[in-house]
Design a protein with these regions (language model features):
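Surface-exposed beta-loop interaction hotspot
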Residues: 2-4, 114, 118-122
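Short beta-strand and beta-hairpin "edge-sheet" elements
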Residues: 70-115
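Short linear motifs in intrinsically disordered
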Residues: 1-4, 51-61
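One face of beta-strands
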Residues: 8-12, 24-26, 42-46, 63-65, ...
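Charged, amphipathic alpha-helical segments
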Residues: 37-56
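Short conserved beta-strand and strand-loop elements enriched in small hydrophobics
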Residues: 8-17, 59-74
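Solvent-exposed edge beta-strands and adjacent loop segments
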Residues: 2-43
Length: 122
């Protein structure tokens, strides 16, 4: 399947709807999927030069965090889902601005998540 990319402003928190520990522009790569369906497999990067945010990401490495992407550039609904994040090595990121993002669960591409939907007839 062909890959698609989206660039959107985003933030990472320790839990869903939590206070952000890092924020910046995110590049998300995923295989073409049905619009508005959750993305099970995706990866990306965040640009973040804030030293405190980078320290928080380093301290949380190996744990599941939460990514929230704001609507931008033709996407009219926020995207959100669990993520693991780690700083990219200084050999590949000499300016210390890149954070690698890896799926830790589906990335929901609409305002109401799958887990929040009310069953039919309820």
């Amino acid at each position: 399947m062909p890959a698609e990319t989206r660039t959107m402003p985003g933030r990472i928190s320790r839990e869903r709807n939590g206070d952000p520990i890092a924020s910046g522009w995110c590049l998300i790569v995923y295989e073409t999927a049905v619009r508005h369906e959750p993305l099970d497999e995706w990866r990306g990067e965040m640009a973040c030069a804030d030293p405190d945010a980078r320290q928080a990401i380093a301290a949380a490495e190996g744990t599941t965090l939460y990514l929230h992407l704001d609507p931008y550039g033709g996407e009219f609904e926020p995207w959100h889902g669990p993520v693991t994040a780690k700083l990219i090595s200084p050999d590949l990121d000499p300016y210390g601005r890149r954070i690698a993002l890896t799926s830790a669960g589906p990335l929901i591409r609409f305002r109401q998540g799958v887990e929040e939907k009310t069953p039919a007839g309820a």
